[in-house]
């Protein structure tokens, strides 16, 4: 089934809480499975304390897990707006993030999901980090993609994902921004440099706002590398619709399968 979808991503004017120069980066290695609609991820994230405070914890956004529970802030918002699509889904259809490992500078740390915010993770650092100090956080986790809700998820070999990978919360006014995903466009991601390596079935077509740097076919698996500088949001579309394209118009990236735009 083909979807007539046009997603416009404004790079020049996208508002976010971020720094002009990012010292944060995410190196993400991922494998997409069409069989169970999951993405296994190994991620190394470089974090520099750009505040004037000593930090004893780090807050991570896990937007994919917003869809995992009928008690999540996102589900409650949908219910209040008379959208019961998540409530009607069973647990396998709602999607979730399963984290198997979090290390800071190669050492085990304690972490938890913040009460009443199942899409926020608090990492307790083994020792405080000073201003301008750098740490490397290693994650291993699996993303299970939910049924299509609020333009996120999967339906009939069409998969649309926005900010599915783990990202840093902004630190504003001497505190972390504790803000759950509510399905809005104004998701406050810290601008970061991104390297994404993804393996997926070659019968699918991947489009992203990131720049493709390499592509390699081995059997029926495509291995591709994407990069982005000072990126707020990461958009991924996996589809069997080969007409999806990425266009750049006046510093605005457009992901579209609208023939009137492509031709």
Residue spans for each PLM region:
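Bacterial N-terminal signal peptides
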Residues: 8-16
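Ligand-binding face of N-terminal immunoglobulin V-set domains in extracellular IgSF glycoproteins
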Residues: 40-66, 71, 80-83
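Bacterial N-terminal signal peptides that target proteins for export
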Residues: 1-9
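Juxtacatalytic substrate-recognition/specificity segment
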Residues: 196, 247-263
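N-terminal, polar/Ser/Thr-rich
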Residues: 15, 19-40, 48-54, 157-159
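Hydrophobic alpha-helical and helix-loop surface patches within well-folded domains
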Residues: 6, 22-24, 62, 226, ...
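Extended, low-hydrophobicity, Ser/Thr/Pro/Gly-biased non-transmembrane segments
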Residues: 82-96, 100, 113, 140-237, ...
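Short Pro-Gly-centered flexible turn/kink motifs
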Residues: 130-139
